[in-house]
Regions:
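Intrinsically disordered, low-complexity segments enriched in serine/proline and basic residues
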Residues: 20, 27-28
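Charged phosphate-binding loop/patch that engages nucleotide di/tri-phosphates or the phosphate backbone
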Residues: 195-212
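Extreme N-terminal basic, low-complexity initiation segments
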Residues: 1-10
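Leucine-biased recognition of intrinsically disordered, low-complexity hydrophobic segments
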Residues: 4-5, 26, 35
Length: 212
């Protein structure tokens, strides 16, 4: 009962900020809705700021696409509730990075936001969410990619492996926090991944065949 009350309080706060646009998740009571103030969001983004609003907007975009994949492909047996939570948390580390164009005023390179978020989630005892955070850059990075490109990341394979990790990574690629109003097509998204090499584009197109 205490937990349920806490969720309703969080929902009321969100209503005051977003008005009629708001939606919340109080699974299993509102299983088809998404946005609610997850305890980790309240902990790391306690105030209503442009960054928190952008994070929630982007998270909802990613969640909606991921849940559409769940609906289209019940044969995949995807964990719907986990995907919803993963979409909310996957970018939680962005506040630690230096990307003022999207309201991030930390000190680390933006490329590290995944591993930064993973570190936070491991401190919270959530290895499943840590993996989501660190494995959604591009279509995933290998230790060789990181070493050859001199990326500011640990030299280890950071590849989405479970179906949920792959769906989250795929859904995320259609949206950019620097242009939050846009939704890329499959073709535009494939083009945007060319910076990660031909293998990344190939993997994305394989996902498109599986998930669309």
């Amino acid at each position: 009962m205490v937990i349920l009350l806490a969720y309703f309080i969080c929902f009321a706060e969100y209503c005051m900020v977003y008005g009629a646009r708001c939606r919340c998740v109080l699974a299993p009571f509102f299983n088809q809705s998404f946005l609610f103030m997850h305890p980790f969001i309240l902990k790391y983004y306690p105030e209503d700021t442009p960054l928190r609003r952008l994070l929630l907007h982007h998270s909802e975009q990613v969640a909606n696409r991921a849940l559409q994949i769940c609906d289209r492909h019940p044969e995949l047996g995807l964990n719907r509730d986990f995907l919803r939570e993963a979409a909310l948390i996957h970018d939680i580390g962005i506040f630690l990075t230096d990307a003022p164009g999207i309201h991030c005023h930390g000190t680390s390179p933006y490329l590290t936001h995944g591993v930064q978020g993973a570190a936070l989630m491991r401190k919270e005892g959530r290895e499943d969410l840590a993996r989501i955070c660190e494995r959604h850059t591009g279509t995933g990075l290998t230790a060789e990619n990181i070493r050859q490109q001199g990326l500011p990341l640990p030299e280890s394979d950071l590849l989405p492996e479970t179906l949920e990790e792959q769906v989250l990574c795929y859904a995320d690629k259609f949206y950019s926090k620097s242009h939050p109003e846009r939704e890329r097509t499959v073709e535009q998204t494939a083009k945007s991944l060319e910076m990660f090499g031909a293998e990344g584009v190939k993997k994305f197109l394989t996902w498109a065949e599986l998930f669309e």
